[in-house]
Amino acid sequence: MAAKDVRFSADARDKMLRGVDILADAVKVTLGPKGRNVVIEKSFGAPRITKDGVTVAKEIELADKFENMGAQMVREVASKTNDIAGDGTTTATVLAQAIVREGAKFVAAGINPMDLKRGIDLATQAAVKDITARAKKVASSEEVAQVGTISANGDKEIGEMIAHAMQKVGNEGVITVEEAKTAETELDVVEGMQFDRGYLSPYFVTNAEKMVAELEDPYILIHEKKLSSLQPMLPVLEAVVQTGKPLLIIAEDIEGEALATLVVNKLRGGLKVAAVKAPGFGDRRKAMLEDIAILTKGQTISEDLGIKLENVALPMLGRAKRVRIEKENTTIIDGLGEKADIEARVGQIKAQIEETTSDYDREKLQERLAKLAGGVAVIRVGGATEVEVKEKKDRVDDALNATRAAVEEGIVPGGGTALLRAKKAVAELKSDVPDVQAGIKIVLKALEAPIRQIAQNAGVEGSIVVGKITDNTGSETYGFNAQTEEYVDMIQSGIVDPAKVVRTALQDAASVAGLLVTTEAMVADAPKKDSPAPAMPGGGMGGMDF
């Protein structure tokens, strides 16, 4: 086992604090509408330019192991906030630094760290309760756009695009962000349920120019197994022909005689039909077929359920207003499923999302949820150069996460105002234990840190801004617009933050900072002393005169 280097009390805390400061100082320059960019060197390709706090934090690794431990703890704050709320990472870092700095001063002055932490926790709970109580539900698409705009650093186009996407696919819908091949940023919305399987034969195409098959008001046969012989299918095919409606067959595979007969029927005009393979694999395929069945008010024809293909009647088939089948994708638009059944299925998938521990499974479940709940929107981010596209994509990701959080828990006045107003609730806390009271005092001061940093990044003195907002007791939403350097009603001006983001940033910062303040010893691998290289043997041949 390698030898260890151990540091204690003040020595350990000083080193740790230096690491916290290095990371936090690099991250906090990005805060607010006038925050600066950070350029990150990449081992290959162009450097990356970003204003995303967590991206900066993840890149920082310090040479000194003890300083690095402090930096990594604060990096954990940014990562955790990013995982839960998807935004607010810089705010969380600024808060953590403020709590650790103040805490270290008190500990150096001889205050009990454990009581100090208790005070920090009490004050944090009071502030979180206050922020949650102030939250205002997001009612209009305009408010969604405002949240997106603020989080995208004042880029109105991004805010409006996200609001439009949410309007189209609903709050449960999937919105993905991709890099575009062009300079324009655009929104592409797929309504209905889409899965990545196309037609089994190009002969099913109804529009030869676009190479797509479009079926209006079709019946949908959902079959779990392979279809290779025609005989079992005849009764259901004849029943559909009688109605004069088209038929879509979704099965594990369709081959041989069955496929040939369907193609011949289609070409002769006897039956408008198209066939596609079922999406997914294994158990996931079963679940997705069941989703399609619920969406279209049909039944999955499965021998597990004791239903044989020859016994299938028309009521067992699904229905939809329209189905569009391309070479790679199939989209079912306006399935005729019962709303109550679809909602029950959505609830079931949500419960599975809560339970799963695998990120991959969670992602797949969310995709299924979105397809059932409304649709999929893709924001394609464009720019003149690759560096610009990556920087913009970071901002779109942040804005998207912020708007989701806003819809979930509501909005509060932005620009650090909500944290500053929460001081009132924290100031009411009183403890008989002086050391606990000191912890409350630390949080009181830390709650000012984000607004001070936003002001500083805008080139304004933070203390003046804090004083002016605190003195205005008439309006709870009165704050500082760093973009225009004016004092305004934050909600009316559309400067809002999601309550979830503000709450999570404070909770995560206080949690990690509390642990750092109570640190008394640090252990790291001792640096290895390299042994000197052996001397080179003398050159030439001994005993020979040249």
Curated annotation (Swiss-Prot):
Could you confirm whether the keyword Isomerase appears in this record? yes
Q: Where is this region: Disordered?
A: 527-546
Q: Can you quote a single GO CC term? A: cytoplasm
Q: Does the keyword Endoplasmic reticulum apply?
A: no
Residues the entry annotates as binding ATP:
T30, L31, G32, P33, K51, D87, G88, T89, T90, T91, G415, D497
Q: List the disulfide bonds.
A: none
- Enzyme Commission number: 5.6.1.7
Locate the compositionally biased regions of type Gly residues: 537-546
Q: Which PROSITE patterns match?
A: CHAPERONINS_CPN60 (PS00296)
In terms of Pfam families, this protein maps to:
Cpn60_TCP1 (PF00118)
What is one process in the GO biological process aspect for this record? protein refolding
Give the signal sequence positions.
Answer: none
Q: Where in the cell is it found?
A: Cytoplasm
Gene Ontology molecular function: any one: ATP binding
Q: Catalyzes what?
A: ATP + H2O + a folded polypeptide = ADP + phosphate + an unfolded polypeptide
Swiss-Prot/TrEMBL keywords: ATP-binding, Chaperone, Cytoplasm, Isomerase, Nucleotide-binding
Subunit structure and binding partners: Forms a cylinder of 14 subunits composed of two heptameric rings stacked back-to-back. Interacts with the co-chaperonin GroES.
NCBIfam families linked: GroEL (TIGR02348), PRK00013.1 (NF000592), PRK12849.1 (NF009487), PRK12850.1 (NF009488), PRK12851.1 (NF009489)
Similarity comment text for this entry? Belongs to the chaperonin (HSP60) family.
Free-text function comment from the UniProt entry: Together with its co-chaperonin GroES, plays an essential role in assisting protein folding. The GroEL-GroES system forms a nano-cage that allows encapsulation of the non-native substrate proteins and provides a physical environment optimized to promote and accelerate protein folding.
- Which HAMAP family does the annotation name? CH60 (MF_00600)
Would you tell me the protein name for this molecule?
A: Chaperonin GroEL
Its source organism is Methylorubrum populi (strain ATCC BAA-705 / NCIMB 13946 / BJ001) (Methylobacterium populi)
Which gene is transcribed and translated to give this protein? groEL
